[in-house]
Structures are given as structure tokens and as C-alpha cells.
Amino acid sequence: MAYQVLLICLVSTIVFAYILWRKQSKKNLPPSPKALPIIGHLHLVSPIPHQDFYKLSTRHGPIMQLFLGSVPCVVASTAEAAKEFLKTHEINFSNRPGQNVAVKGLAYDSQDFLFAFAPFGPYWKFMKKLCMSELLSGRMMDQFLPVRQQETKRFISRVFRKGVAGEAVDFGDELMTLSNNIVSRMTLSQKTSENDNQAEEMKKLVSNIAELMGKFNVSDFIWYLKPFDLQGFNRKIKETRDRFDVVVDGIIKQRQEERRKNKETGTAKQFKDMLDVLLDMHEDENAEIKLDKKNIKAFIMDIFVAGTDTSAVSIEWAMAELINNPDVLEKARQEIDAVVGKSRMVEESDIANLPYLQAIVRETLRLHPGGPLVVRESSKSAVVCGYDIPAKTRLFVNVWAIGRDPNHWEKPFEFRPERFIRDGQNQLDVRGQHYHFIPFGSGRRTCPGASLAWQVVPVNLAIIIQCFQWKLVGGNGKVDMEEKSGITLPRANPIICVPVPRINPFPTI
């Protein structure tokens, strides 16, 4: 019986593909490699798709069409093409694709619950407004400055103690702890590290969720394979979501009990964090958008993945580049010593006076963008750059490839922060206004966490440079630059270093 069902599905797919081919052969479609029956171009795409898209674009042009299984796709690989899709045709390409098995499973069987993946509509607009006003506005960034400072000091103190003892550290793991604690305190008013087991679990969960969301799942593209779960995704998704539920359900339950007691005693909470705001909406019958527990948990998942993984990975890539380019590292250290000195640690207010450090961060984001692919979907058919783009076409803007385009970047594969400095000032904003440099995307669906990343990444990178020399364990003094799959751009291998204290910001240690 299963064989008969599979045979019917295969025949149906071939017939559908033929009808689609006949229909589209009359249109002016983008150039495309030769496709295979049923799988289309899936055989050309590895688990790290942005690299394969880049290689294909060198042969087929800046805008090319691919069929990933039964899903029609278009890949934009230059700044000019990105601008057409993300600015000229922004409204038509404001939706996210809806077939992602991992996202749907992690988001409690509704992709709409995850703000980052929700369709462009009332819920997405409401959640973005909530995120920007209650968590990431300038007012909230200022209010949470002491939190970021405290967590940075704890991070440096922890690494400093290991350095004094001559212990090696997993650089990325330490950064994940730092980012996790910052996001947790901003969102939940508590550190995940207040409970060591919970901290370790949350770090693993954030990494697992980011990896699952970004993995290339063949079932997303060949619909009749979903019941078979050939890659074992469903089991991993359920296991990860169940573990996430255990942690977050406990936090929500504890907060609800605190709120109940405060209400009984008439005690007013001095400051409401993001969880309080979400629970207020959950309890308010007249709220503009009614949030249930699944909405709240999905939003917390969104914030942790976007706020934790992106910042930690960006700092880790920056240090990998600096270790491999010691002249750049030394120049950055000299700038910090000249501007800040050695008697105190760098603060966020110093960053404006450290143009070379800012250039290092920008150059890191050029080569290692937090999101290597901007993924959208067309709401209706359109003509872009002279090509017919049908409705429901999945768009991949290859940010990773755009950062390596020799038409915009001289010697694009070299790490050269100087390219961002002109007349002593940094050039190019990171928020998507310059289409050859869009590390956080562009337009109304620009990553909302860009403002937090720009607060967290430069200052912590500066302090790491200022306080320590870094002695690489193994690797012949060089860090490998291999990537692995994920929704962000994680490193394939950890950076293991011995932090050699250079200045002592903690005289009691």
C-alpha cells in the first residue's frame, strides 16, 4: 500500500512538473542550470546553501532560477539585484516561506507564532512594534546599559580567572554564556547562569534551535517525503521543543506566582520586563492581539535565538579573523590603548572614538554576516530586472555572496578593515541602506536585533582585545575558517585559546 501511494505521488509530481514547465516556458524566466526530474536542483545544493548559490551565480548570473524539489526559487547574488527585490518590490517580497518543517514544529505547529517567520500582516506588525518599543528601543537600550555592563564584567572576570590559572577556554562557549545572560536579563530579568544546569541547557537549546531552523531539510521541498522524515528531523525537533518547554514553562510559572502574590499584597513592580508585558497581554481580555502561552513561548524563543546566537557568533568570527591577521589585531589594540588607556575597561560610550575597531566589526559582518541568506516569498507575480517572477516563488538574497562581489569590494576575500574608513570616519551603516552591505537584511523585515548586536558586539570585542593576549591551542597559530549550517553563520569548529591577561581590571583577583 505504501508503495502504491509513493508511486502515485511520483507520477503526480512528474505530471505537475510538466504542466508547470509548459506554463513557464512562455515566460521570460531567469537563467537556470539543468534540472533533474522530481528533485529539480536539490542535487546542486549542500547543507551550506549560500556557498553553493554563490558558485552557481558565477556561471548563471546575478539572478537565477532554481527548482528545489517542487518549490520555485530565485537567487539574487548582487547588490543591484538585492535592491530590486528588497526595495523596489519590497511589499511583494515581505512574506516568509511557509513550508519550513523545523520552524513549524518548534513554533508549536504554527509558523505564524514565531515573529521572525510570521507572514507579513497584523500579527507580525504588532509583535515587531512590541519588540521595538519594549525591548529594543533607544530608551530600553539606555535602561539596560547597567545590565550589559554587569554581564560583561562577569564574563571578563570568568575568563580572567581561567587565564591566571593558565586554562584554555572555548571562546564561542564563553560568548554564548555572555549573550545568553544579557538577553535573559533583558527579557526575563534573570540570568540563565543563576542555575548552572539551566544555563548549560539554555545554551545548548539556543544552538540546537538555530541549527535546526537553518538546516536544509529535503522534506521542505519534496512534499510527499514529509511523512517519512528521512533525515530524522521530526524527532530532533520534538525533543528540542520539549526541552525548551521544560525551561520556559518553569520560568513563566514562577513569574505568574510572583505576580499573583504582588497583586494580593498590593505590591507594585518597579520595572516590567518583556515577560511581564507579554503576560499583561495574555491576561488582558481587551488586548489588541490576544496572546496565549504558545505565543509567549515562541516569542521568547525568537528573542533568544536572534539576540544570543547572532552576537556571540559575530564576536567569535571577529576574533578568528584577528588571530589570523595579527597586524590588524595589534593596530586595534594600539587604538584602544591610545583612546581608553589601561586603567579601565572599554565602555560603550568609547566606541564612537574607536573608528578602526568599528571598521573591524563591519569587515567581520561583510565576510561573516549574521544571516547569510535573506529568505522571502513573492505574494504575487512580478517583473524584476526584466525577468518574470511567478507568485509563491521563494527568494534567496545571498548576503554572503554580495559581501564577496569584486564589483563593490577590492580584494573581497581579504580581511581589510581599512576599506570602511575614509577621512578617519567609518563608512556604511549596518542597517540595510547600502545594498552591497546588508548584514542584517533590509527593509521592513530587517533583523530587529541589529541595534542590540551593535551595542553588544563592538564593546565586548574591544574589551577582549584590550584585556588579553590570545594563545591559540593547536592549529599552527591559525584558526580554520570553516562554516557549518545554521540560521546564522556558525563556525564548524570551536576556537580554543588560553587567555593571557594583559591588563588587570580586577585588582582583587
UniProtKB/Swiss-Prot annotation:
Class in the EC hierarchy, top level: oxidoreductase
This protein's major location comes to: membrane
Localization annotation = Membrane
Provide the reaction this enzyme catalyses. (6aR,11aR)-3,9-dihydroxypterocarpan + reduced [NADPH--hemoprotein reductase] + O2 = (6aS,11aS)-3,6a,9-trihydroxypterocarpan + oxidized [NADPH--hemoprotein reductase] + H2O + H(+)
Q: Could you tell me which SUPFAM superfamilies the record lists for this protein?
A: Cytochrome P450
Entry keyword Membrane: yes
EC number annotated for this UniProt entry: 1.14.14.93
**Can you tell me which residues bind heme?**
C447
> What does its record list under induction?
Up-regulated by methyl jasmonate, elicitor treatments and elicitor peptides GmSubPep, GmPEP890 and GmPEP914.
Field pH dependence: Optimum pH is 7.4.
Which processes are annotated in GO (biological process)? defense response
Cofactor(s) the record lists: heme
The cross-references to InterPro entries, in alphabetical order and at most eight, read: Cyt_P450, Cyt_P450_CS, Cyt_P450_E_grp-I, Cyt_P450_sf
| Metal-binding in keyword set | yes
Which CDD domains does the entry link to?
A: CYP93 (cd20655)
Q: One Pfam family, short name please?
A: p450
Q: Example GO molecular function term? A: 3,9-dihydroxypterocarpan 6a-monooxygenase activity
Query: Which is a Gene Ontology cellular component entry for this protein?
Result: membrane
Report the temperature dependence from the record: Optimum temperature is 30 degrees Celsius.
Q: Which UniProt keywords apply?
A: Heme, Iron, Membrane, Metal-binding, Monooxygenase, Oxidoreductase, Plant defense
State the source organism's domain of life: Eukaryota
Family, according to the entry, reads as follows: Belongs to the cytochrome P450 family.
Its job: Cytochrome P450 involved in the biosynthesis of the phytoalexin glyceollin. Stereospecific for (6aR,11aR)-3,9-dihydroxypterocarpan.
Protein's name according to its UniProt entry? 3,9-dihydroxypterocarpan 6A-monooxygenase
Organism encoding this protein: Glycine max
